[in-house]
Amino acid sequence: MTKEPRFKILITNDDGIKAKGISLLVSLLRDANFADLYVVAPLEEQSGRSMAFSLIGPTAVEPFDYPQKVQEAWAVVGTPVDCVKLAIGELFKDNPPDLVLSGINNGKNSGRNLYYSATVGAIREANLHGIPAIALSQCENISFFQEAQMSSLIRALCEFTVSHKHANPLGFNVTFPASSDNSPWKGIRFTLSGDEFLFGIPRLIRTEGNRRYYTLYDMQDKVSEDLSDEYLALANNYITAVPLISKNTPLATLSEEELAFLKESFEQSVQWDSSLNFEEDLA
């Protein structure tokens, strides 16, 4: 009996290689047991760095003794994009990954926040190299993440993203909701990205000579009156999966017919419990 080939998955994040979220992701993938795992992640937190990379100075990489069993682990003094560039262009240049996963981020990257996000920046970089990729983020705090049944869902997401054929590599921005009572998630919804974004007000915290130091405070979502499907799905305790097709702008290369086909294919393929009511009204 011929064994199915195992995926080669590159795992990165922006919270740092020691963060809880990336450890959870490794655990889920190990439980699913369909891929060989390679961790290349920042040594320190890189939140909000988007697609920044080390252009004007060197970056550094060193082997890392990862506490869970993986094929290899490397810590990078740099951004998530640096991690992907080093992994694809140097560390694994002779045998690149089939898929790049970034996360699980401590905090949401839904709506327009995906443009700020270094978690999402990593998957955009992977897409630029022709590799499908998925960003994963947990609303509020990683402590809200619900591990039950997530191994099968993560596997379904990975298999769909790799197997779906399109002229350009497919990426998804996946966000897990959080509720005050931590009630079980209802399912997963394929949506387009919303317009909401995190807004803060600069606050002066100190002055040293002519130099003034600021931080942002009163951070909250700026939303329009016409709430997006993504926002409503998360508010109603659904996981969201937003497709990102790389060629300059999200979805720029998809016709309405192609997008409808992608949505239909996703909804047929990516489920983890068929008894869930995916047609529940979000209103």
Swiss-Prot record:
Citing just one GO molecular function, the answer is: exopolyphosphatase activity
The cofactor note reads: Binds 1 divalent metal cation per subunit.
Which coenzymes or cofactors are required? a divalent metal cation
* The name this protein goes by in its record: 5'-nucleotidase SurE
The record's keywords, sorted A to Z, are: Cytoplasm, Hydrolase, Metal-binding, Nucleotide-binding
Source organism per UniProt: Chlamydia muridarum (strain MoPn / Nigg)
What is the enzyme's class at the highest EC level? hydrolase
| Role this protein plays | Nucleotidase that shows phosphatase activity on nucleoside 5'-monophosphates.
A Pfam family assignment = SurE
Q: Which family is annotated?
A: Belongs to the SurE nucleotidase family.
Primary residence: cytoplasm
Q: Where does a divalent metal cation bind?
A: 14-15, 47, 105
What does the record give as the reaction this protein catalyses? a ribonucleoside 5'-phosphate + H2O = a ribonucleoside + phosphate
